[in-house]
Every structure is written in C-alpha cells, then in structure tokens.
Curated annotation (Swiss-Prot):
Cofactor(s) required for function per UniProt: pyridoxal 5'-phosphate
Positions marked as site (Plays an important role in substrate specificity): 228
Enzyme class name: transferase
The reaction(s) this protein catalyses: (6R)-5,10-methylene-5,6,7,8-tetrahydrofolate + glycine + H2O = (6S)-5,6,7,8-tetrahydrofolate + L-serine
Subcellular location: Cytoplasm
Keyword vocabulary terms for this entry: Amino-acid biosynthesis, Cytoplasm, One-carbon metabolism, Pyridoxal phosphate, Transferase
Name of the protein in question: Serine hydroxymethyltransferase
Pathway: One-carbon metabolism; tetrahydrofolate interconversion; Amino-acid biosynthesis; glycine biosynthesis; glycine from L-serine: step 1/1
Keyword Cytoplasm: yes
Residues recorded with modification N6-(pyridoxal phosphate)lysine: 229
Organism: Xanthomonas euvesicatoria pv. vesicatoria (strain 85-10) (Xanthomonas campestris pv. vesicatoria)
Principal location: cytoplasm
Amino acid sequence: MFSRDVRLETYDPELAKAIAAEAGRQEDHVELIASENYCSPLVMEAQGSQLTNKYAEGYPGKRYYGGCEFVDIAEQLAIDRIKQVFGADYANVQPHSGSQANQAVYLALLQPGDTILGMSLAHGGHLTHGAKVNVSGKLFYAVQYGVNEQGLIDYDEVQRLATEHKPKMVVAGFSAYSQKIDWARFRAIADSVGAYLFVDMAHIAGLVAAGVYPSPMEHAHVVTSTTHKTLRGPRGGIIVAKGASEELQKKLQSIVFPGIQGGPLMHVIAAKAVAFKEALEPAFKTYQQQVVKNAQAMANTLIARGYKIVSGGTENHLMLVDMIGRDVSGKDAEAALGKAHITVNKNSVPNDPRSPFVTSGLRLGTPAITTRGYQEQDSIDLANWIADVLDAPTDEAVLAKVRDAVTAQCKRYPVYG
C-alpha cells in the first residue's frame, strides 16, 4: 500500500505499538550497553530520507546506474569528512556493518587458510577476530592472544605467538577491554614477522576522533570501525587508512564492491555524513572527555563497593565487572538490573568458569548516558544503584527502590524529549 496520507499507527498498529514502546524504553531505562548510543535527530532525519530509494552500485563518479548525481554528493561528503576526522588519506564508507568491514579487510589481504593473530573473544576480543564460530575463524587459521593476571594485554605473549606462528595478519582491537592499547608495540610485532597490522577500533572510534584515546592511524596498515557506538552515528561500518599504497587501496575498494556487497545503503551513508560532521565539532571532544570521566567515576564507585573491575579500572568508555566466585551470574545480574530499568549485557570475563550463555561478568559503558547529559555524580549514583541490585538481585523491594530512582534520573535527562 502506497499512501501519502495514512500514518503507520493506522496502517500497521502492531508495528507502531512496538516502535512506540521501544521509544519509551529508551527514555525511561538507562542504557549502559557499551556498544549502544543515541544518534542525533539530524542523523535520523538523513537516514529516513528519500535516499533510501536509490540504487547506486559503484563509487562516486563511477556508478552502474543513472540518476546518482545527488547520492554521489552525499557519499563524497561522508568520505571527505571521515578522512578529516581520523587524518586518513583513504576511506570507504560503504560497509553495511563493522563485521562486513572486517570481512572485507580479511578477504582483500589474505587467502583462505592463512594465519591470523587476534585477541581471544573470552579475553575481550570480538567474534570477527578469529573466533571459531565466526567466518574469520573458519576461513583462516586463527591464533588467539589474551590478557595476563592483571587483565592487561600481554605483549610478550603476542610477540611469542607471532614468532611461533608467523601470521599474515595481526589483529588489534577489542569489544571488552578497558585500557589503552600500545599501537606502536603491535606494529613492531607485526613488522617482526612481515605481517599486516589490522586495527578494529569500533568501540573507541569516537574517543580516537576526539583525541582522548591514542590513534592507530599512524601504525596500522588498515583500520575499520562501526559508525555507531562512541562515534554516535547510524549503524554501519567504515574502512580507513593512512599511507596505504595504491595497490592496497584498490584491493580494499574492489573487495567491498563488487567483492562482498552490491548496492550501498545511500540513506545510511547520508546519515554517516551527518555524524562525521558532528564528530568534527568542538562539542564532540567535550562529549568524549565526559564519556571517559563518567566511566572512571562508575568504575571507581563499583570498586569501592567491593566489585572487581577487570584490569583494575578504565581508560576508555567501558568496564568489565568480574563476578567470579559470587553467587550471582552475569545472566542473572543482567535480568535483575533490567527489572530496575538498567540495561546492561552479561559478558564473559578472563578465565570464566561459566558458559558464554551464563557468564560471570557484566560489561558496562557510558556513551549513551553521556549523550543524555550525565555527569560524574550521576554516574556515581548509578554505580551505587547497580551495586545495590548486585548485592540483592532477588530482593523485590531493592529492585523497586532502584527502579524509581533510575526513572527519576532518566526524566531529568530525556533523550529526545
């Protein structure tokens, strides 16, 4: 049915009700999933535009369809802006996701069966860094490094594994690691065995853009990221590089299209362009600085309440709460906090005795609450409420008290109003 007059709530009330309920949940629940954020109304306006109708296989100026003169402008804006954000001289903004951006890098630079060296999912890495259940661990021989007893990346172990296995690619980046990474050390390790250094900065891209976390651009052969998370754009992916050879750039271009994707999502690329412009604003740096301040305030409060944070604290936007030895599991903690309107995700911790479906950890992140306007004291209050729930996860009176406090806090900091 095509109509300019009928509204969604009239035509499809079931779907409209679900969308409205989710909008309400985002307003009255506090979002602490480290990979989630709230994109701006401007980003959503671009993503909901007529550009969703346009097919545009190819790249700006080299399309396989007519009528691309305006979407070419949108994509070129996104390319130029993300280059400026990260100081890159190559950028591809077409990947539909971070996982597809990673897949593109692997397929552009490796052959099936080649060895890759990446961070273990169980120690804070990502599925796409060589996990056996992921295509990256099926197409390639994946060797995994981890963290030491202090919860820090063991660079000596990474070097030892690289020397032993001679990977074609070293993968650096994470989904649950709260300290800074020594990109120069990783590059030295990769160079010592003649490997590519590939950095997945999906979680920290916004922090890198604002200069509050070390940039991998001077060290990596190629870098990928999502465009949501700390970058606060639409869901999608990018590939960027600095100093990449013309041959490497051609490989990356051709593997994204026509290698693994067909038509790009032009409405999403337009939304990316808006987000990249926002990332160039002075306010974006202030925001990212506050993200880290809020994370550190939360981590310090949880430590003071007797909870262990993997690596002893955080230097970015996230922290991993280690509950090994406690009666409450990550799964149960996630459910209890959800009842109190605090949204988190269970997460495995290093040497976790529980299964990945249960876990002994929680991953917490501050990008979304900082977008709402939370400051350090708000984060301290929130961390204390989290500890209250974790101390008594089955006490309905505690859950109700925390839920009321969280609801009141959320009302002080509306997302979209």
